[in-house]
């Protein structure tokens, strides 16, 4: 099991690493690393909204709930290293839970998402964490994200409460708004940053559940006939 590092409370506030990251055309095939991250949370918290904002720079007021698994690819360059990220958007409904488990097993990191206007969605995060880490406790970077920060007047979950929860569970924390495009890039860029920095110094980790996926060994989910790429 990879030991979680101590979280620097100010680290997410430092944007220096973001300035070093470039989003590339996703037809760019050559890459050194391929990382997988799974979006987890109840239906309606905005998982698809965050993903669509990041990949397409677009926001829909009304989304249909994800059925099964959606899948996008982002190609990013950091520190002169080109990486691809497979981003798996999982359905939040109970009936799709078993399908989500297949992708949880192969993730390098998790992004647990709740709606700041819904206390219930925040309470359910603990169950998502338990489910995910029970199946895969070899992840490198896990996040807690309070989505819909644009709805401050409807807030039900205080930022301090979420911060305390994140510290307790060794999660990186931020609030975001897919609608107002706040902290969306920072979230996915920070995931990439943590992954690249980790593997630059741990190239030879031998762990059956955390094998580094490199160029020419991409694994495409069988549920989808073709991948969708991220464009901006």
Task: Please place each PLM-identified region on the residue numbering.
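Conserved P-loop small GTPase signature centered on TRAFAC-class small GTPases
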Residues: 1-44, 48, 78-82, 138-232
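Switch I (effector-binding) loop of TRAFAC-class P-loop GTPase G-domains
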Residues: 55-82
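Switch II (G3) loop of P-loop NTPases
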Residues: 83-98
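Conserved Walker B
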Residues: 91, 116-117, 149
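Inter-motif core of Ras-like GTPase G domains
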Residues: 97-118, 131, 135
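Amphipathic helical hotspot of TIR/SEFIR-family domains
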Residues: 119-137, 190
């Amino acid at each position: 099991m990879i030991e979680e590092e101590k979280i620097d409370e100010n680290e997410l506030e430092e944007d220096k690493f973001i300035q070093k990251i470039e989003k590339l055309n996703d037809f760019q095939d050559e890459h050194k690393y391929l990382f997988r991250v799974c979006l987890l949370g109840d239906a309606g918290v905005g998982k698809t909204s965050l993903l669509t904002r990041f990949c397409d720079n677009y926001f829909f007021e009304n989304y249909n709930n994800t059925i099964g698994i959606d899948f996008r690819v982002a190609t990013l360059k950091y520190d002169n290293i080109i990486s691809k990220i497979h981003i798996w958007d999982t359905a939040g409904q109970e009936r799709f839970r078993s399908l989500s488990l297949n992708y949880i097993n192969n993730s390098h990191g998790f992004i647990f998402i709740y709606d700041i206007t819904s206390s219930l969605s925040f309470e359910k995060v603990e169950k998502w964490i338990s489910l995910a880490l029970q199946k895969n406790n070899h992840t490198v970077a896990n996040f807690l994200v309070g989505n819909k920060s644009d709805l401050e007047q409807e807030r039900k979950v205080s930022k301090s409460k979420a911060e305390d929860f994140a510290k307790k569970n060794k999660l990186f924390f931020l609030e975001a708004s897919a609608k107002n495009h706040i902290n969306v890039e920072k979230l996915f860029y920070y995931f990439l940053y943590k992954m690249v920095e980790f593997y630059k110094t741990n190239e030879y980790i031998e762990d059956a559940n955390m094998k580094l996926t490199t160029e020419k060994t991409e694994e495409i989910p069988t549920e989808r006939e073709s991948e969708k790429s991220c464009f901006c």
